[in-house]
Amino acid sequence: MERRGSNLPSDSLLEGAAAWREDLEAHAESVHSQGGEDGVLLRLFERIGVRSRSFVEFGAWDGEHWSNTANLRLNHGWQGLLMEGSDRADGQLVRRERVDAENVEALFAKYGVPQDLDLLSIDIDGNDYWVWDAIRNYCPAVVVVEYNVFFRPEMARTIEYDPAHAWDKDEYPLYHGASLAAFCKLAEGKGYRLAWTEPWCPNAIFVRAERLPRGVVLPDWRAWTRWDWSLDDYREPTPRPGGRWVAV
């Protein structure tokens, strides 16, 4: 596997795209997040504006460890819904809910999530693609997802939808989630642009295109690819028994 650096498009938009990237990289900082998301999110909301200081995050663990929303909640006056399917949820700060494509919008309604929430963070190590796809009546300004890095950049793949899926990180650690290309295709269809990926963590941040400042130029999504795999020895990750990868 080869690490990829700045792979910016060599056209007349290079300067603007590079400026966007350099600005976010300069603001990357972790207070509670895993790989700089705290600082990047603050900078993004400085640029696109905030409506209600509202968020939803699942799976949220204990609401603080590697959380993409804890800094906003604890230090910047935001409020929102935290959900986690495991026993890490305390039932008060973090609601114990198993989120899937069938129940995600019902859960949003149950807990009074505003339709125009500011931030949605998805990290459930499984049906992430399908759950975001199922969110049709809510329109977050920014969406953070964890993607599967073990695909070549052009491969748009996700696990087959299975509401009972549980990540087997010991026996089949690579069978989870969806590739960056898959999320980018889904995001484009929903009206989002890829605004950032973490240099060392498999997290991607998407912003609604209509919320971007007028005239801003974002790098092409391929410029955000942080990992690459040689064609000579590449093998698609092995699915667990009964599972399969789906091209999207």
Name each region found by the language model.
Residues 82, 121, 142-146, 193-199, ...:
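A structural signal for short, well-ordered beta-strand segments and their strand-loop junctions
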Residues 3-56, 68, 107-109, 154-248:
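Rossmann-like AdoMet/SAM-dependent catalytic core
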Residues 76-78, 139-141, 192:
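A short helix->loop->beta-strand "cap" motif at the edges of active sites that frequently abuts
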Residues 130-168:
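A short alpha/beta connector and helix-capping loop motif
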Residues 117, 131-132, 191-195:
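Short helix-to-loop capping/linker segments positioned immediately adjacent to catalytic or ligand/cofactor-binding
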Residues 114, 137-139, 189:
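Secondary-structure boundary elements
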Residues 25-115, 119-122, 126, 149-152:
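SAM cofactor-binding core of SAM-dependent methyltransferases
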